[in-house]
Design a protein with these regions (language model features):
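Beta-strand-enriched cores of mature, soluble protein domains
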Residues: 1-135
């Protein structure tokens, strides 16, 4: 796999519902993307829903839009749906779907993509990096 780009995420809110068998986390966030082909910011409304049931792998599903400019200065928006599983060791691997409204960039996102979540060491403990890879 080859590194494609990173998305910097800042967690802005957290809500949880918990029972004896299931925990659901609702995480809101903002952030940005700095890639050679695109620079942009995550719009308000980004949310990650995580579900953890006893005896099953945890699941996550994040949806958000990044609005910015391509490397030629043209307005560009990316819709990202990032679904994945959390393993017992806490690592998370995802299968992102990315829809791009820029005809020149859109083919870049037609490849099989894989995402990995990387924690960022910061005092607030509210930041992660989503690393996107191509096959």
């Amino acid at each position: 796999m080859e590194k494609f780009f990173d998305i910097n995420v800042r967690i802005t809110g957290f809500n949880q519902v918990k029972t004896d068998t299931t925990t659901v986390n609702f995480i809101t966030f903002d952030g940005d993307c700095q890639a050679p082909f695109f620079t942009g910011k995550i719009l308000d409304g980004g949310v990650d829903t995580q579900k953890f049931e006893k005896g099953k792998p945890g699941t996550l599903s994040a949806r958000y839009i990044i609005k910015g400019k391509d490397s030629k200065g043209r307005d560009t928006s990316l819709f990202i749906e990032n679904n994945g599983f959390a393993s017992e060791d806490g690592s998370i691997e995802t299968s992102p779907f990315i829809l791009c409204d820029n005809d020149e960039l859109a083919p870049l996102f037609s490849k099989k993509l894989t995402g990995r979540i990387k924690n960022v060491d910061c005092p607030e403990k509210n930041r992660i990096i989503i690393e996107i890879y191509t096959e």
